[in-house]
Regions:
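Small-residue-biased structural context
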Residues: 1-172
Length: 173
């Protein structure tokens, strides 16, 4: 059984056990060089909501132990939206192009190899769908939630946002 991380734990303990935590630090805008500082001190120094950070870290560490209702109450939505936008940027700007480069390196892309070109075409279409989906979230879903948090009634209804979001998911299936 894995234990949850807490605000008093050293941040170095969080990253030493799982390399994925480095990506989470980056997406929250936390840089390395925190030494022996606690999670709380590190997050506060970086202007990151401690509860939101711990919720994401503990969920990634062990999703089976996550209690979604407890998590919702602890999360600062603007902090989570920033994290999600940074995650989208990482995937669209770095991860997807890196996967494509590795595919090209692994495939025989000679003029006579149509299979390689079909694989690349399929990947490019998939990557475009993922990028489109993330762009939709960044331009519609996140602003919708942000306007609700400001107490404004958005011009789009929740049903319109979710219907469009679901249609994007079904396109990629």
């Amino acid at each position: 059984m894995t234990e949850k991380y807490h605000d008093g734990d050293p941040m170095s303990d969080v990253i030493s056990g799982d390399y994925r935590m480095l990506q989470i630090l980056s997406r929250f805008g936390i840089t390395l060089g925190f030494g022996d500082k606690s999670v709380s001190d590190t997050c506060k120094a970086a202007g990151v909501d401690v509860s939101t950070f711990l919720t994401v870290v503990n969920y990634v560490k062990d999703p089976s132990r996550a209690h979604i209702n407890d998590m919702v109450e602890q999360v600062d939505l603007p902090a989570l939206i920033r994290y999600l936008k940074n995650s989208h940027s990482f995937f669209v700007d770095f991860r997807l192009p890196n996967i494509r480069r590795r595919l090209i390196e692994a495939l025989d892309c000679s003029a006579s190899n149509q299979i390689a070109f079909l694989i690349l075409k399929f990947y490019d279409e998939y990557a475009a769908e993922v990028a489109h989906h993330m762009e939709y979230e960044n331009t519609h879903v996140h602003p919708f939630v942000e306007s609700l948090l400001r107490g404004e009634l958005p011009s789009e209804t929740f049903a319109a946002v979710t219907d469009q979001h679901l249609s994007l998911i079904h396109i990629s299936e």
